[in-house]
Amino acid sequence: MSYHKSSGTTLMVPLFMLLISVNYFMSCNAQLSTTFYDTTCPTALSTIRTSIRSSVSSNRRNAALVIRLLFHDCFVQGCDASLLLSGAGSERASPANDGVLGYEVIDAAKAAVERVCPGVVSCADILAVAARDASVAVGGPSWTVRLGRRDSTTSNAAQAATDLPRGNMVLSQLISNFANKGLNTREMVALSGSHTLGQARCIRFRGRIYNSTLRIEPNFNRSLSQACPPTGNDATLRPLDLVTPNSFDNNYYRNLVTSRGLLISDQVLFNADSTDSIVTEYVNNPATFAADFAAAMVKMSEIGVVTGTSGIVRTLCGNPS
């Protein structure tokens, strides 16, 4: 295709659209504030914290589930609690979110907040705060959460299929996927560190055993093969972090250095490529990882937020009203 003399005009249109997008993003984020509920619901944060602490205390796996919920929500349609909506055609019903759990943890936190401040605090804000509190509950970093998100009334299963990263992605695909959400390579590696918590099913890591040329430690490979044969046992769970799966630390990266990453998308972060140096830095400097993770979570939690008079404040997080 040739633009000839019209190419100048053609180039200006995307630039104009880019400026609109940047200004819109900045405008939405500018409406977020750490003091958003100080007068309308001053006990909101303490109520959420108490609820999340209780949930994680009863089952430490809940910390991983909550952090994953925020990630999956923000990567599809922005951080608007659209993932929490139930029903046919919703993100929640998408095969891309098959295996995503923990909705009841957020429902419990929402119910607790509704009892003290009915109709005030959005599910999107509760999810953002809950992820921070879940991290702290298992020894992870804390960060400041700016508030004022509103809840969307729509949810898109098809978009979940295209926007969420997959466990079999290679490094270039991961970098591109995160870049599409405004997150750079270092932030991608830091956020992948959330895999210091939680588990994955055999159906998600089978490719790492049988369909990958990535290095894999022999004993680790043997253990995975026994738990996850070429067919069957799809629901068998294995920890993403072999050493301390219920504590937030940097052992996830130590596993990668010894070729014991559970998913393909884990091990590609340390595979004689551009991100090896970041992984090594996080192995040697856990405080750097914690700081980078916290900063990346702040940035991710403000992707595509709905603010002001847009959206709603749902009474029930699974119901679009």
From Swiss-Prot:
UniProt-annotated binding residues for heme b: H195
Catalysed reactions, as listed in the record: 2 a phenolic donor + H2O2 = 2 a phenolic radical donor + 2 H2O
BP GO terms, sorted: hydrogen peroxide catabolic process; response to oxidative stress
Tissue occurrence: Expressed in tracheary elements, roots, young and old hypocotyls, and stems in the partially glycosylated form and in roots and young hypocotyls in the fully glycosylated form. None of the isoforms is significantly expressed in leaves or cotyledons.
Superkingdom in the source lineage: Eukaryota
Annotated site residues (Transition state stabilizer) in this chain: R68
Glycan-linked positions: N211, N221
Binding site for substrate: P165
Cofactor(s) the protein needs: heme b; Ca(2+)
PTM annotation, UniProt: N-glycosylated.
EC number: 1.11.1.7
Binding site for Ca(2+) 2: T196, D241, T244, D249
Cofactor note text: Binds 1 heme b (iron(II)-protoporphyrin IX) group per subunit. Binds 2 calcium ions per subunit.
Uppermost EC category: oxidoreductase
PANTHER family the UniProt entry points to: PEROXIDASE (PTHR31388:SF215), PEROXIDASE 72-RELATED (PTHR31388)
Protein name per Swiss-Prot or TrEMBL: Basic peroxidase
Lineage: Eukaryota, Viridiplantae, Streptophyta, Embryophyta, Tracheophyta
